[in-house]
């Protein structure tokens, strides 16, 4: 009788157990350094000290089958990780580039120190130290979103090391605080970050990154982020993100675009509407923020050796939304002849 009762109870539990297993497969939990999320190439670690912290930068170093003698460094955005560059790494490596794709400190598989003065200068210096440890000096630098702001700062700090600069829907082409976006404390950003869910990520990415469209191809990147917020490091991930939010909103680079001296390929999805803190701004101001068709043209006019490539129907992440179109334009734009003979917006 007892055995029959136990078997009956177990059978009754099976649907719940199956549902739980299904949920864990579709709603994974990842560690604070994205433990459990697979990257497309082996992840290496650069260990160093900064601001009295012993830190690690995770990175992928992908060697081409037929080298062209050039190295490309890919800098990810705030809601992205080095893994999201997979298609771009493939395209560049197939074209002969050695490709180095790091996760910045505070992001993804890299260290997330609780006490750290985040600045684009510091992240640039960290990246420069990583490249020096690999014996890499002259690079083609590709930055997307927040990585675009970082790439601009890196190119300003180390102009002799950057042969070419490609900016993919970089944020920071406008100064939000100068446009009346209210200042937020790190504590306020932290409270906002704690409300992050897969649904909130998906809705934001659908409207901003992919111009109102959605594809199952995008879902792994939603779960990549949401999994860290579901996991045991949720508090640390939210705090690190808040520190980065503060850095982005208080350290504009737009006023220094005219100081860039290397050839710059500026790639803009015209459906992009990204503006950090847009929802905090007065409604009249909100409507003017994140106008990427205008911002791209204004930036290209400021940069001495700029070539502007626009994607009329794409949003904030053209390399993910339309990889074939994007990578064709990227490779064509990075050809030495294309960059050296084009000056001004196109």
Feature roles, as predicted:
Residues 51, 55, 62-109, 329:
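Conserved HGGG/HGGXW glycine-rich cap/lid loop of the alpha/beta-hydrolase fold
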Residues 152, 156, 165-196:
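Flexible "cap/lid" loop of the alpha/beta hydrolase fold
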Residues 230-298:
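Conserved serine/cysteine hydrolase catalytic core
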Residues 44, 83, 104-120, 176:
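Glycine-rich "HGGG/HGxG" loop immediately N-terminal to the catalytic nucleophile
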């Amino acid at each position: 009788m007892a055995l029959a009762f136990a078997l009956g109870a177990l059978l009754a539990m099976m649907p719940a157990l199956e549902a739980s297993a299904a949920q864990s497969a579709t709603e994974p939990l990842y560690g604070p350094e994205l433990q459990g999320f697979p990257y497309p190439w082996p992840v290496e670690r650069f260990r160093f000290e900064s601001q009295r912290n012993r830190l690690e930068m995770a990175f992928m170093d992908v060697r081409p089958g037929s080298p062209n003698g050039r190295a490309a460094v890919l800098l990810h955005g705030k809601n992205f990780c080095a893994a999201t560059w997979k298609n771009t790494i493939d395209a560049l490596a197939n074209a002969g580039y050695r490709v180095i794709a790091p996760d910045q400190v505070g992001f993804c598989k890299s260290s997330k120190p609780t006490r750290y003065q985040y600045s684009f200068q510091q992240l640039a210096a960290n990246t420069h130290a990583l490249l020096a440890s690999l014996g890499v000096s002259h690079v083609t630098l590709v930055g997307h979103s927040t990585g675009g702001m970082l790439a601009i700062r890196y190119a300003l700090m180390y102009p002799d090391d950057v042969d070419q600069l490609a900016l993919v829907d970089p944020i920071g082409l406008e100064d939000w605080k100068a446009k009346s976006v209210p200042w937020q404390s790190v504590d306020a950003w932290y409270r906002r970050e704690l409300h992050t869910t897969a649904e909130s990520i998906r809705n934001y990415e659908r409207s901003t990154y992919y111009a109102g469209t959605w594809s199952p191809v995008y879902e792994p990147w939603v779960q990549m982020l949401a999994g860290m917020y579901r996991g045991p490091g949720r508090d640390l991930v939210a705090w690190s993100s808040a520190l980065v939010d503060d850095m982005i909103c208080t350290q504009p680079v737009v006023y220094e675009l005219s100081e860039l001296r290397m050839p710059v390929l500026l790639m803009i999805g015209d459906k992009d509407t990204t503006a950090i803190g847009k929802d905090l701004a007065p409604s009249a101001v909100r409507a003017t923020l994140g106008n990427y068709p205008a911002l791209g043209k204004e930036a290209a006019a400021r940069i001495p050796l700029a070539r502007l490539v626009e994607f009329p129907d794409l949003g904030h992440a053209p390399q993910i939304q339309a990889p074939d179109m994007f990578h064709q334009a990227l490779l064509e734009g990075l050809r030495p002849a294309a960059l050296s003979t084009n000056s001004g917006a196109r």
